[in-house]
Amino acid sequence: MYSAISEKISETITLQRQTSSRYIEFFVFRNVDINELWTTDISEDKTHDVWPAVNKKSFKKFLENELTSYQRPIPLLGIPQNGTVSKTCKKEKQRETDCVNYERKHGNPVTFYPRHRAKRNANTDTCISEEPSILVSHHRNSKMDVFMDTNKITLVNRELIWVPHDQVRIVKLDISLYIPDGFFGVITGHSNDVFCECVTEIITDETDISVFLMNLSEHSLMLLPGDVEFSINFLPCYIPEPWEMINLSPPEFAIFHLKASREFIAKPNSYTIQYFDAMYVCADELKALMIPSKEIAKLGLLIETYIWNKDTIPSIKIFNSTRKTIYIPTGICIARIIFTCGHFCLSLMPERAINRLQVLDANSSFLFHYATSNNA
């Protein structure tokens, strides 16, 4: 058995041969070039900090003739060997077929935005993971301008947005996304008007994406073009094992739901903090992102996004932006939870009702496929 720890990602790669079936197994989770396996020598004074030396010819011959190889989906960073996966990893040819089928169906060409990064592959029969590929379909009659960076999508309103007083405005972004397996998107928004709050949203594979705008003032708001900006960042998701979760129900499409264990009330124009008897004991690199549920947002309750760390119980900060007392019954979903290895922080906003979530993963890159659509 050979075992090494990559200097790039601090993940273990194991090559194991079983005499019965001559089976070899390896796991690659991020930027890993398999060719380094047989190009780097290991000395006695170094203990598992570089790749081991392997005979290239004999190893390739073994792969081609006497081996059934399997590679776990690369986007699922750190997932246990017997963990639960909500989606399957598609082959590169299948992703190309999806783009061709989309063009035939909608009659619109697909624009490619290449990103330069080394390929990660093992052998021709395994799932080859290229740049994470994201298909963006922008409706022609959209009220949003779309800008694509190396690692995120930015949307800015190009028309007026009316936000009524004491109501929640649901704004359609007029885009559809095809997110690759093992990834999810998080939408963060910012408005130039201090009385307008944008509710953070998470998406997995959406065709009708919308966000919530809350009016905290005593009169209606008219947001001018360019006043609202939404950023969609993409991060790898993770599904913990059942024994790593305490008092959490099974997930739906990698998303857990945090429900109220007891009833409570939210007084008008005031804050309340609710604690929940839940905990998780996953790896240190993982954290849970708690996003307000749509049921709570429709009631006019503003929930601050919470970064939930391991071995702690979550607390939710709720602000009632209405002028009436809101009763929250037992069992209603307060927040949605998704586990990731991404990096976040809460930017302090003294002039705002809640702090703003900021995604710090700026080094990741994606391959965006852009197309226009005639859908309304």
From Swiss-Prot:
Gene3D superfamilies: 2.70.40.10
Stored InterPro entries: dUTPase-like, dUTPase-like_sf, HSV_DUT
UniProt-recorded Gene Ontology molecular function terms: dUTP diphosphatase activity; metal ion binding
Catalysed transformations (reactions): dUTP + H2O = dUMP + diphosphate + H(+)
Keywords assigned: Hydrolase, Magnesium, Metal-binding, Nucleotide metabolism
Entry's EC annotation: 3.6.1.23
Group of enzyme by EC: hydrolase
Disulfide bridge positions per record: none
Pfam family, one: dUTPase
Keyword Hydrolase: yes
Named cofactor requirement(s): Mg(2+)
Keyword hit for Magnesium: yes
GO annotation (BP), single: dUTP metabolic process
Similarity-based family: Belongs to the dUTPase family.
Function: Involved in nucleotide metabolism: produces dUMP, the immediate precursor of thymidine nucleotides and decreases the intracellular concentration of dUTP to avoid uracil incorporation into viral DNA.
Protein name: Deoxyuridine 5'-triphosphate nucleotidohydrolase
Encoding gene per record: DUT
